[in-house]
Design a protein with these regions (language model features):
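Amphipathic, hydrophobic secondary-structure cores in small proteins
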Residues: 1, 9-10
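Absolute protein N-terminus
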Residues: 1-2, 53
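A generic alpha-helix surface/boundary motif
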Residues: 2-3, 41
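Short Gly/charged-rich anion-binding patches and loops
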Residues: 3-4, 25
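Residues within the helices of the helix-turn-helix
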Residues: 5-6, 45
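Major-groove DNA-recognition helix of helix-turn-helix-type DNA-binding domains
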Residues: 11-48, 52
Length: 53
């Protein structure tokens, strides 16, 4: 249901620090759309739409 920072760092082959920035950015977009977000996690469907569409 959610990807964690560690999973995103592994998939994108980036540092954990960069993965946190990506997650924060995606969660900021979700908040603007009215969704409740969880720090350090991003919904799998939303992540896949943004990175693998």
């Amino acid at each position: 249901m959610f990807y964690t920072v560690d999973e995103i760092a592994t998939m994108l082959q980036v540092s954990k620090s960069k993965a946190y920035k990506i997650v924060a950015s995606l969660n900021k977009e979700l908040k603007k759309m009215g969704y409740i977000t969880i720090a350090g996690r991003v919904p799998k469907k939303y992540f896949q739409e943004k990175f693998y569409a």
